[in-house]
Amino acid sequence: MPESQSPNSSTNAPVTGTTHVKRGMAEMLKGGVIMDVVTPEQARIAEDAGAVAVMALERVPADIRAQGGVSRMSDPDMIDGIMQAVSIPVMAKARIGHFVEAQILQSLGVDYVDESEVLTPADYANHVDKWAFTVPFVCGATNLGEALRRITEGAAMIRSKGEAGTGDVSNATTHMRGIRTEIRRLQSLPADELYVAAKELQAPYELVREIAETGKLPVVLFTAGGIATPADAAMMMQLGAEGVFVGSGIFKSGNPAERAAAIVKATTFHDDPEVLAKVSRGLGEAMVGINVDQIPQSDRLAERGR
C-alpha cells in the first residue's frame, strides 16, 4: 500500500499520507458523535454539545431528499466559515467518483473527506483513488464486501450507511448487523476457504485473511443513517459501532442543542439504561422522518456507489 511521499517540484510527485496517520486520525474519534451542520452557529452548538467532529454541508440529508435535484460539494466559503467557527475537526462531502471535488476539499484544509452517497454520484463505475490524497477519507458501506472495496481504494474510515435523511434507524441496524455477521463468518472459515470468500466479497485475499484473524475491520467502523434519538445511538453502539454520525436527526428536531448533548451522552454511556433514560427526557419532538419501506428501492441513497 502507498506510503508517505515528499513533494518534489521537479517531478510533481503527489503528496500522500501514510496509512498509519490517516487511520490514526479516525481512531481519535472513536466513541464519539459526528454531526451534520449547515451554518457556523450549528457547528458551535455541536461543539458545545460534545461532538468530536462536524460534517459541513449546505443541506442536511432530509432536505436533500425532500428538495431533490443534483446535490454537489458545498461552497468553499460555507466550509471555511464552519472551519473558522469551531476547534474540532471538520469534515466535508464530495460526490462519489468526483476526484476534483476531493482535491478542492483537501486544498481547503478539511480534516476528512466523506465520499458520500448522499450527494449525487459523479461516476457510477469508479470511486475516488483515495491513496492519491493526503487527507483521509470516510466512505459508506451496506455490507462487508462494500466496506472492503472502499478500504482497498484507500478509505481510512467506514460508516455503515443506513438510509440518510429518514429518521428511520432500521437500515442502520440491518447494515451494522450484516457487517458484523459477515466478519464472524470469516472467522469461522478454514484458511483454504478464505480464497473463495475473497472472490465472493470482491476483495483482496490478504485483507480478507486479516479480518478473519483479527475479527474486525482494519479501520474504524462508525454508523450513520436514520439516527434520531439517544436510544438509536446507544443501540448502534451496542451493535458494534465505534461511533455515530448524526445528520438530520438533530437540527430537524424540536430542541437541537439538548438533543445533540443527549445523543453524545448516550453514545458514551450506551450500556447504562439509567443514564439513557435520564438523557431521553424532555427533548421535545424528534424529526418526523419517513419510513424506509415507503421509499422505492431505486430512490434509496444507500444503493448508490456499491
From Swiss-Prot:
It comes from the Bacteria. Its EC number is 4.3.3.6. The gene is pdxS. Coiled coil: none annotated. It comes from Salinispora arenicola (strain CNS-205). PROSITE patterns: PDXS_SNZ_1 (PS01235), PDXS_SNZ_2 (PS51129). One of its GO terms (biological process) is pyridoxine biosynthetic process. Pathway: Cofactor biosynthesis; pyridoxal 5'-phosphate biosynthesis. Transmembrane segments: none annotated. The lineage of its organism: Bacteria, Bacillati, Actinomycetota, Actinomycetes, Micromonosporales. It catalyses: aldehydo-D-ribose 5-phosphate + D-glyceraldehyde 3-phosphate + L-glutamine = pyridoxal 5'-phosphate + L-glutamate + phosphate + 3 H2O + H(+). InterPro entries: Aldolase_TIM, PdxS/SNZ, PdxS/SNZ_N, RibuloseP-bd_barrel. Pfam families: SOR_SNZ (PF01680). Belongs to the PdxS/SNZ family. D-glyceraldehyde 3-phosphate binds at residue 177. This is Pyridoxal 5'-phosphate synthase subunit PdxS. Catalyzes the formation of pyridoxal 5'-phosphate from ribose 5-phosphate (RBP), glyceraldehyde 3-phosphate (G3P) and ammonia. The ammonia is provided by the PdxT subunit. Can also use ribulose 5-phosphate and dihydroxyacetone phosphate as substrates, resulting from enzyme-catalyzed isomerization of RBP and G3P, respectively. D-ribose 5-phosphate binds at residues 36, 165, 226, 247-248.
